[in-house]
Amino acid sequence: MKKFVCLANLMLLVVFSTTSSLAVAQDEVEVETVVEGLNNPSGIAIQPETGVVFIADSGALRVVRVIDGKAEPVIVGFTRDNYGKGPIYDIGPLGLLFLDKDTLVVGGGGKPDGEEMIRVYKVPDPGAEPIKAENTEGEPKMLPATDAMVGEGNFYGLAKGAKGIYVTCNGDDQKGWVSLATLSGLKIDKFERKIATKMVTLVDAPVAITISPEGHVTVGQMGEISVAGDSLLTFYNEDGKMLDNFRTGLNDITGLAYGPKHGRLFATDFNWLDTDNGGLYKIIAIKDNYEECKAQEIVKLKKPTALAFDSDGNLYITLAGNTSEGAETPDGKLVMIKGLDFVPED
């Protein structure tokens, strides 16, 4: 018990915000629309050196970048699949991650489980013709079914650690795999199942993922979309050993991101059971409680799917939109909250 308590204290101190110093009133938060007309956008990455925002415009089967307030196609021609219970969402590309300024990793969602791919691309220059989804750098990697395991798909979240790229997968609901793509230079060498999250948390559907400032693999376990309040926040070392696991009280965590200035941890909650009351939350420690953390609401958002900070502490968030509910034209958005993790100068 003593060892667990010490570890839990460490996680609470270095990973979470504290209630007293980080209160944010909703009326102080201004959400700006950056781009409209997206179709179930499901991933964000900020291009190194340029700060340009790239989006997985998933239902439109493409990756775009934001230039002068407009979505410019970068990679097109992904295949289509769908996801959801009740509302059904078209999906293509999902998670995004830059390895350097010109090298983008894309997690797929448009193929059947076992045929889904993680792919690497050299992005064209701004204004150039978009490239086709099949024009990859190196061979795409998959996690096909074996005699003992079902095939994996829906590579929703990507996060780069010291050992490679950690990928959340939604194929085997009994295991809830986070997989690891190891790199050879700027190409994927091997892709293998790494952390069976459901086996240790007893909750399925790892979706959100990031790397903590201390190098821990940080996973948002979405849980069942038909069950309220079951999302978890779990920390692993890069060997796959669980370090700690916390109840959040959130419904369906879709994104996690640490602010670049303060190192505060933020989460998006899609809230499938009540999408009008999804939102952005800051994760806060509860003193002397080693099983739960507090999710402090920053602002309500409808159907948030992913988030990413730029180097100035501005937070970008994708909102899926209402095409699954009969909207005639795609109405997904990229929104921004300026300076959410800004450190004022003395």
Where are these regions (language model features)?
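Beta-rich, blade/repeat-based domains predominating
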Residues: E36-T50, R80-G107, P140-Y166, K198-E224, ...
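Blade-level signature of beta-propeller repeat domains, shared across WD40, Kelch, NHL, RCC1
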Residues: A306-D346
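Structural motif
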Residues: D113-R119, Q174-A181, V227-L233, T275-Y281, ...
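A short helix->beta-strand "capping" segment at the edge of beta-propeller domains
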Residues: A25-L38
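Beta-propeller fold detector
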Residues: E32-V35, G69-T79, A128-A145, D189-T201, ...
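Short loop/turn segments immediately following the C-termini of beta-strands
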Residues: S58-G59, G109-K111, N170-D173, E214, ...
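Short loop/turn segments that connect beta-strands within beta-propeller blades
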Residues: V66-K70, K122-G127, L183-K187, Y236-K241, ...
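C-terminal segment of classical bacterial N-terminal signal peptides
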Residues: V14-V24
